C-alpha cells in the first residue's frame, strides 16, 4: 500500500511538472504573439564561462510574424542572420561567405527563430520554464550546441532582451533599445547572395 501511494505521488508530481512546462510554453507563445512587428537596436555582451566580459557589440533586430527574422550585427564585425520562414541564412560580408539551412533543421542550434515562430515542431525542440517575465528554454536534443536560451518579454508582448548560453558556459546577451512597431516590408527578410559570395547550401545535404 505504501509503495502504491508513493508511486501515485510521484506520478502526480510528474504530471504537475509537465503541466507547468506546458503552461510556461503557452504563456511565452501568447506573449510573443501580441506583437506582430518589431524593430530595435541591440547591445550585445559576450561573457565567458568564468564570468569575464570578452566582447561588446551592437546591431539591429527586425522581426515580423509569422516566421520572419533579421538580425544584423554592426560591431565589432558585421554579420547577418536572416530567415524568410523556410531558409535561415548566416552571412559574413567580411569573408564573403553565407550558409543556408532549412529553418526546421536550424532551430536546435539557432533558437532566435522561435521569437516569430508558431510552428509546434519548432517549439517541441525546447522545454520552457517561467520566472516572472523571463522564460528559460532548454533544448530537448543533446546534439544542440546551446545549453539554454533565455527570453525576457513583458505581459504586453514587448521583447526586452534575450540570451544564449552555450555548453561551454559562454553567454551572448542582447539587450534591446529604441523599440518601434513600424511596418516592415517582407523584402527585408529575403536574401539573395551577391556575385562572388561563397554559398554553403546545407539544404542539399
Curated annotation (Swiss-Prot):
Main location: periplasm
One Pfam family here: LolA
Keywords (A to Z) from UniProt: Chaperone, Periplasm, Protein transport, Signal, Transport
CDD domains hit by this protein: LolA
GO process terms (BP): lipoprotein localization to outer membrane; lipoprotein transport
Keyword Signal found: yes
Keyword Signal: yes
Gene3D superfamilies on file: Lipoprotein localisation LolA/LolB/LppX
Signal sequence range: 1-22
Subcellular location: Periplasm
InterPro entries: LolA/LolB/LppX, OM_lipoprot_carrier_LolA-like, OM_lipoprot_carrier_LolA_Pbac
GO cellular component: a single term: outer membrane-bounded periplasmic space
Role: Participates in the translocation of lipoproteins from the inner membrane to the outer membrane. Only forms a complex with a lipoprotein if the residue after the N-terminal Cys is not an aspartate (The Asp acts as a targeting signal to indicate that the lipoprotein should stay in the inner membrane).
PANTHER family, A to Z: OUTER-MEMBRANE LIPOPROTEIN CARRIER PROTEIN
Family, as annotated: Belongs to the LolA family.
Quaternary structure note: Monomer.
Protein name (database record): Outer-membrane lipoprotein carrier protein
Organism whose genome encodes this protein: Haemophilus influenzae (strain ATCC 51907 / DSM 11121 / KW20 / Rd)
Lineage of producing organism: Bacteria, Pseudomonadati, Pseudomonadota, Gammaproteobacteria, Pasteurellales
